Amino acid sequence: MLHVEMLTLLFLVLWMCVFSQDPGSKVVADRYAVYWNSSNPRFQRGDYHIDVCINDYLDVFCPHYEDSVPEDKTERYVLYMVNFDGYSACDHTSKGFKRWECNRPHSPNGPLKFSEKFQLFTPFSLGFEFRPGREYFYISSAIPDNGRRSCLKLKVFVRPTNSCMKTIGVHDRVFDVNDKVENSLEPADDTVHESAEPSRGENAAQTPRIPSRLLAILLFLLAMLLTL
């Protein structure tokens, strides 16, 4: 019975060590809704950008049409995450990777929605990790039948942690294109433009580390367990 109690205590200490290490954690997460279509006025201006905090969400809604709209009148997009150069030139071929595909304009369940969580760490080898104080870029391009190339692009700035203090709440806050909320924090001159690459090799370097004091307690409890 004593072994079970010690194992339970050991598990609780380990759980505290791991889950107390996320400096970007917060109680309330904001969700930013972006309607990805050419009729969105914020895309038409060419300067669409949002400011987010770690653990916020980006919800991308694809174009959706009634069944009566012909296929050749619908919009379809492939969305890419790119670096700053790819964003400026609206070119994903040199340094970018495919993120989502809006390919079901007549979906019976409504518009396709894709969500991005701006998290510091991801358990997936091809997932993307975000850093406070850096900019990230999304683009899409479509070539209509008339050959005219169109480009929609979005810039996302992840705010520094000290500017993301949240009050306690029950529900996520949702912002969409019609909200009259101006971004109060513009990127500083020294803002880092993040490279558009998944976090394959960075996971090992960025994995949360257990503090030395808690590690000592953990080893002490393990030693006690082994002597029983």
Curated annotation (Swiss-Prot):
Disruption phenotype: Mice display cataract an opacification of the lens. Residues 204-228 form a propeptide. Keywords: Cell membrane, Developmental protein, Differentiation, Disulfide bond, Glycoprotein, GPI-anchor, Lipoprotein, Membrane, Neurogenesis, Signal. Residues 29-162 form the Ephrin RBD domain. It is found in: Cell membrane; Membrane, Caveola. SUPFAM superfamilies: Cupredoxins. CDD domains: Ephrin-A_Ectodomain (cd10425). Glycans are attached at residues 37, 162. InterPro entries: Cupredoxin, Ephrin, Ephrin-A_Ecto, Ephrin_CS, Ephrin_RBD. Its main location: membrane. Residues 190-200 have a biased composition (Basic and acidic residues). Residues 186-205 are annotated as: Disordered. Coiled coil: none annotated. GO terms for cellular component: adherens junction; basement membrane; caveola; cell periphery; external side of plasma membrane; GABA-ergic synapse; plasma membrane. A lipid is attached at residue 203 (GPI-anchor amidated asparagine). Residues 1-20 form the signal peptide. GO terms for biological process: axon guidance; cellular response to follicle-stimulating hormone stimulus; cellular response to forskolin; collateral sprouting; ephrin receptor signaling pathway; negative regulation of substrate adhesion-dependent cell spreading; positive regulation of collateral sprouting; positive regulation of peptidyl-tyrosine phosphorylation. It is a lipid-anchor; GPI-anchor. Pfam families: Ephrin. The keyword S-adenosyl-L-methionine does not apply. Disulfide bonds join 62-102, 90-151. Belongs to the ephrin family. Binds to the receptor tyrosine kinases EPHA2, EPHA3 and EPHB1. Forms a ternary EFNA5-EPHA3-ADAM10 complex mediating EFNA5 extracellular domain shedding by ADAM10 which regulates the EFNA5-EPHA3 complex internalization and function. Binds to EPHB2. Interacts with EPHA8; activates EPHA8. Cell surface GPI-bound ligand for Eph receptors, a family of receptor tyrosine kinases which are crucial for migration, repulsion and adhesion during neuronal, vascular and epithelial development. Binds promiscuously Eph receptors residing on adjacent cells, leading to contact-dependent bidirectional signaling into neighboring cells. The signaling pathway downstream of the receptor is referred to as forward signaling while the signaling pathway downstream of the ephrin ligand is referred to as reverse signaling. This is Ephrin-A5. It comes from Mus musculus (Mouse).
